[in-house]
């Protein structure tokens, strides 16, 4: 896996960083340690934004990069819209967009966990000037566990990686 000709890191390399953070998040969910989940969740969500920027800058199916419009072209792009809405409202303070809940979230998965990070309702997010992505946020993220978002975003970005770059062996992360 080589960087792009301008020496930037390629999309699959960035996706591997996202996946490594998501794996650490899922492993941390099995502990009693809140930091073991928050730190990798914060990292994974920042990877989401970096991958979004790369997809918009690099994907040009009609000759010109699509920018944020790439999200309208594929299934799952609305999840990226929703996360971007949260990020823009929280101004990089992901703790303002997520809440730690104690107890179980449905559907129940095994092994059982004692805590779960979930997205706050949009009405609880800091106020902002731009409502772009709010409907997607309310529909897809609000009051739902972050783990569901991480899975959907992985599927979305895997598809984008196949569009941008030929599939090849991924680096271990």
Predicted regions: what they are:
Residues 52-63, 95:
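Membrane-helix exit/interface motif
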Residues 16-20, 50-56:
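Short, functional N-terminal and low-complexity linear motifs
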Residues 1-42, 63-173:
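Acidic, Ser/Thr/Gly/Pro-rich intrinsically disordered interaction regions
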Residues 42-47, 54:
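Core of folded catalytic or high-affinity ligand/protein-binding domains
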